[in-house]
Amino acid sequence: MGDAAVPAMVVEEEEQEHVFRSRFPPVAVPDGVTVPEFVLDGAEAYADRVALVEAAAGGRSYTYGEVARDTARFARALRSVGVRKGHVVVVALPNLAVYPVVSLGIMSAGAVFSGVNPRALAAEIKKQVEDSEAKLVVANEVAFDKVKDAGVPVIGVGDRERMPGAISWDGLLAAADRTGAGVVPVDAAQQSDLCALPYSSGTTGVSKGVMLSHRNLVSNLCSSMFAVAPETAGQVVTLGLMPFFHIYGITGICCATLRHKGTVVVMDRFDLRTFLRALVDHRVMFAPLVPPVMLAMVKSPVADEFDLSDLALKSVMTAAAPLAPDLLAAFQRKFPGVQVEEAYGLTEHSCITLTHAAGDGHGHVAKKSSVGFILPNLEVKFVDPDTGRSLPANTPGELCVRSQSVMQGYYKRKEETERTVDGKGWLHTGDVGYIDGDGDVFIVDRIKELIKYKGFQVAPAELEAVLLSHPSVEDAAVFGVPDEEAGEVPVACVVRRHGAEEGEEEIVAYVAERVASYKRVRVLHIVDAIPKSVSGKILRRQLRDEFIKRMKPSA
């Protein structure tokens, strides 16, 4: 079907505003269902099909029958240890086949799932546990030593001997079996209840809990899956490499695939050989990736060790970081039969907001240089950051979105919520972009200045606070610069106190000891002063531009 048959993008002037809507018709969002009910609907018909399988040899797998069974068992188990509606349970697990079972079980119990990076520092995990007022933590051996002193009970998934004092996962499920499967709590989860509390740096650079309801996530799944062909149910194999503690990992990969009764091939960490072996052995069809992985597929000699001529891979999607045109071209030359799609999403909007190809039969495929088109049920506008006025097509402004997927707010942060979601329900993303006449959206800049290192968000303000805690640092600024492998890397400029003699390497090491590995400062310069505006705001753009200019080879 050609573009001529595709309905045009809808543009309306709403109270003198330029509001853009999807070129596709609205999709129905079922009332009254929770995320687990929506995702596992029809699981009994696929009871013997593998739903989740770990890519590593000998890894755990779950059939749909086992996912449904253990989700219900874990929900009962949580109730038995005192978890009630609205209680937060922090999950500090790496990507494992059991991860979706844990998260869906938490939601089924009426509780709130809050994923955290298991490889973050103990202090960072404890901060999230305390800020979210969590009642429990679920962890395995990777993070147990970091969470055991967080002040709440820990459910240990894995080797009990390596997690002394933890509540046994297996023992808890066995005890739940003895309570009976027919027990229904009087305060069962409702669609309007919160079900997830992921943490995001948002537009301010300070990590905070994003309150998402069952309705938020169900509506986002309905919009993002609008073009999935029903006849492919039970057939799609998706790679689960993106971290499951991230909203895209748990919703866009796990929940979407389980809803469609496909298989998620779970990978904990990226290793090129393991990754390529998973693509070949598991016949992966869809792989959400970050650009550094695609770069390795194109440039690493390891890829030549595999026969990639018969891959089942149909498409890859990048969403966590911009895709360089040169990398896109190189990837398409090496894998000409694989469609490359980009998407745009944010935690505050429950996941995907804009995407590329709509699928066979839906006609419109967004331009490669864009982040996609507006999904059904969404409204988008672009506003002048200074005046707040909405702008017509082809005019850059801050991207704002309104839909049923917009968060309920930031947890315990009313003022920040009001700055991010206005009185008319518009979510202000902090990203600058525009929409063209075909309805394709382009992101051209970021107001929020977050650094995206290998798909992970790194907040300059957080690193600046660590730098300023160093006794020899008087002032500091952090910004991101482009990097071929990582997407962006954090660079710091610091002003030393009078008489201080510490060098650049010593200060970099000081920061590295206090933050997760992906947040480390990669380059540091000693400077005389940090440029700031009249109001005292750091002029990161100026620093960034000057740094890039210095790094360019002279003609």
UniProtKB/Swiss-Prot annotation:
Catalytic reaction(s) noted: (E)-4-coumarate + ATP + CoA = (E)-4-coumaroyl-CoA + AMP + diphosphate; (E)-4-coumarate + ATP + H(+) = (E)-4-coumaroyl-AMP + diphosphate; (E)-4-coumaroyl-AMP + CoA = (E)-4-coumaroyl-CoA + AMP + H(+)
GO cellular component, one term: endoplasmic reticulum
A Gene Ontology BP annotation from the UniProt entry: sporopollenin biosynthetic process
Transmembrane segments: none
SBD1: region residues: 271-342
Annotated binding of CoA, by residue: R269, K454, G455
Single GO term (MF): trans-cinnamate-CoA ligase activity
CC cofactor: Mg(2+)
Stated role: Carboxylate--CoA ligase that may use 4-coumarate as substrate. Follows a two-step reaction mechanism, wherein the carboxylate substrate first undergoes adenylation by ATP, followed by a thioesterification in the presence of CoA to yield the final CoA thioester.
UniProt domain comment: Both substrate-binding domains (SBD1 and SBD2) are involved in the substrate recognition, and are sufficient to confer the substrate specificity.
Entry's family note: Belongs to the ATP-dependent AMP-binding enzyme family.
Protein name: 4-coumarate--CoA ligase-like 9
Lineage: Eukaryota, Viridiplantae, Streptophyta, Embryophyta, Tracheophyta
Name of the encoding gene: 4CLL9
